[in-house]
Amino acid sequence: LTQKSLPNAISVGGRDFSVNTDFRIWMRFAMEYREWSLSDDKTPLDIRYLFKNSIPVFTDINEYIGILQFAFPQNVVPHSDSSSGDDVLFYQYDGDYIYSAFMQAYGIDLLETDLHWHKFLALMNGLPDCTRLSAIMGYRSYTGERNKDESTIYRNLKEAWMPPYEETEEEKKAEE
């Protein structure tokens, strides 16, 4: 929110190129990029659809960085080493859940709305926990580590709320 506008161009070779900013286009790119990154076939992706007017000529692998930074902007926080690194959102499968989450949380009909990719991502990051999509992403991010913490917490709560232990007459006699 420190700037009044969102980015709408990518720099390649020192020159700015206008990009289509609609979330649907970048969702498509995110799906294609994920599939490409998991594949052994490293044929360059056809990304011409990302650009509005002129299409840059890429001469170096580092010139693609602007596209990746636009597609997958990094948030400064939260910073954590505990992330499993697993994907928790799959656009090709989660479309219904994304749609319903935006409708439920924000009253936004994604089929009727033009939305900048970065606005879309900000709203995704801010989805309340009460949406089905948030629950699904929580299931997908489960590592089992939390389970240890929960069992310790519940054990401590159980001990805190149990009535004081009273020795039976037999136990008292056995101690004597």
Where are these regions (language model features)?
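Charged interaction scaffolds used for protein-protein
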Residues: 1-18, 24, 34, 42-176
